[in-house]
Amino acid sequence: MTTIKVVKICGAMESRGLNPLDHLPPPASSNKPLTPFSITDILSKPTVKRFHRIHRLPASDRVRQSITVSRQTLITQASPLCALQELASKTFKGLELGVLQAAEGKDGLKLFGQRDSPKKRRKSRTAFTNHQLYELEKRFLHQKYLSPADRDQIAHQLGLTNAQVITWFQNRRAKLKRDLEEMKADVESVRSTGLVPLDKLAKLADLERCAAAGATGNPGPQCSPRLGHEYKTVHKLCLSPMSSLSDHTSQDCSEDEEVEIDVDV
């Protein structure tokens, strides 16, 4: 019967030119409001609506609603992205603090490890007088190594300390050794190209004699005198006051050979 009545009503309405769907009740509204899916609507609009609802609610309900919103805000702030941002911020703050402390000298050793110990300051070199150099060179010609008695005698005679005498003889032996090695290399290079000039052979022979003279610690023969230009050149090498001896700030003296030795006075 009900179906027949509905059909009759629909037929009567159609005969009058009316649409039966216009008289149907509106559909029940959904519990969840339809919202756009843009980032702005997702992040902003629900918060605005919540605040509008809070103002419309009574005072007691407003307090509860505000507590709920605060909890949701805390949950949002506790998201992984916020936690990562907070961790990065703390890390950079710690680094900035560490750099400032290191710049001010605070806890510098703890941050960057133990610092290297400062290098030992080199002692000032002695500038020998011409008289001292002459006597030292004359003694060096026939005695390359000094006994303790000879060392004390020279130091007392020239007004030097035992350490200064020892250091000078060490540097002088190193200088003679370098001169001899350079002369040998020069002779070998010339020999490979052809005949060796006699003056180079003469210089090499006299340098070897000077190196061998007094090498055992006992006085030996001096450089053998030669006539002509060869003897003058070699004698100049053996006797000339060198820049490394007159001014100990020069680099001619070997740094490896210059060793300070403790001497019992």
Curated annotation (Swiss-Prot):
DNA-binding stretch(es), residue numbering of this chain: 121-180
Domain of life of the source: Eukaryota
Main localization, broad class: nucleus
Disruption phenotype: Morpholino knockdown results in decreased myod1 expression in the fin bud of embryos.
GO cellular component, one term: nucleus
Cellular localization per UniProt: Nucleus
MF (Gene Ontology): DNA-binding transcription factor activity, RNA polymerase II-specific; sequence-specific double-stranded DNA binding
Matching PROSITE patterns: HOMEOBOX_1, HOMEOBOX_2
InterPro entries per record: HD, Homeobox_CS, Homeodomain-like_sf, HTH_motif, LBX_TF
SUPFAM superfamilies, alphabetized: Homeodomain-like
Pfam families cross-referenced by the UniProt entry: Homeodomain
Alphabetical list of Gene3D superfamilies matching this protein: Homeodomain-like
Keyword DNA repair: no
CDD domains, alphabetized: homeodomain (cd00086)
Coiled coil: none
Keywords recorded for this protein, A-Z: Developmental protein, DNA-binding, Homeobox, Nucleus
UniProt key word Isomerase: no
A biological process from GO: muscle cell differentiation
Function (record text): Transcription factor required for the development of hypaxial muscles.
PANTHER family in the record: TRANSCRIPTION FACTOR LBX, TRANSCRIPTION FACTOR LBX1
Name this polypeptide is given: Transcription factor LBX1b
Organism: Danio rerio (Zebrafish)
Gene name of the record: lbx1b
